[in-house]
Amino acid sequence: MQTVFITGANGFIGSNLCRYFLKKDFAVHGLVRKTSDLHFLEGLKVKLIYGDLNEAEKIELPQNLDYIIHCASEVSDMADTKSCEKNIYQATVNFMNHILKSKINMKRFIYISTSLVLGYGKLQISEENPGKPAKFPYVKYKIKTENFLQELRNSHRIPLVILRPADVYGPYDRTSSVPILKGIEDGYPVIVGGGKWIFPFCYVDNLSQGAYLACITPDIEGKAYTLTNDMDVTWKEFFSVFLERLNKKQRVYIPVFLPFVIAFLMKVINFFVPSFERRLNRYRVRRITSHTNYDISKTIKELNYKPDKDIQKQYQAIMDWYLAEKKAGYLK
């Protein structure tokens, strides 16, 4: 039986990776903090390894690891420089130093980055055709971490593969899916400018498939692959399926200029009242008011990647999870 070690195993992406690899008959080890909420891992045969990447030298790594998938990360376009440097870049440096000192003989190290390192606001974005640069700290330190890992691959022959998923959604997603569904239930889903812009969605099982293929495909060390659903879906289309499932109607469409005004006012308030939680910034407005998709032909060709495009099935899986979480009292 092959063994995979997944960092951030209790999170949205990490827990879905655990499920996927268990179904593929892998022995799954998951890194979690002692203070972590382990609800998403309940009932799964995951061997928990307790530790913190900021104290990576204390992590007891199994010696018989075949694959490591590093997805633990700060994940927010609102996160500040200090948090991103610590929890994206430095955490990875610490982890890799510990792996090298532990002399882990792994077959592949998979780093979960983001498609935003290639930019946004353009169609068919790729390394050869980059989009508008995303300049906030989250992306800055994802790029810096990718570069560090590539340097380490060259100097220490780390069998590295980088995955760059677009905007990930699916069951166990409390960050985006839950607020959207709550908004719809409460009767105020807001769509800007008619929701006509294409958005680069990536269902979490498609990300998991990409991670699995990145583990087993030979001769791809040092390469990076972008992951999406390979479908052009607009915000309006994305919302419409959830609206239909919840028997709701879209009531509010707001003009494009208004979110920019709101984002500016939130920035001003946050400047004078740092404790104020900003829910909107100029980047988020630009994302939902410009077309973005990515060219994944390289991923399809080299990994034999076949993304699931059954959005009805995907949305039903999200709905089933969401309603079960509400019934169990995990969501207020």
Residue ranges: model-predicted function:
Residues 37-42, 46-91:
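NAD(P)H-binding glycine-rich loop region in Rossmannoid oxidoreductase-like domains
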Residues 204, 240, 264-306:
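Conserved C-terminal active-site "lid" loop/helix of NAD(P)H-dependent oxidoreductases
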Residues 122-168, 189-192:
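Catalytic helix-loop patch of NAD(P)-dependent Rossmann-fold dehydrogenases
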Residues 294-302, 306-332:
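Amphipathic terminal alpha-helices
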Residues 94-137:
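Conserved Rossmann-fold NAD(P)-dependent oxidoreductase catalytic core, especially the SDR/UDP-sugar
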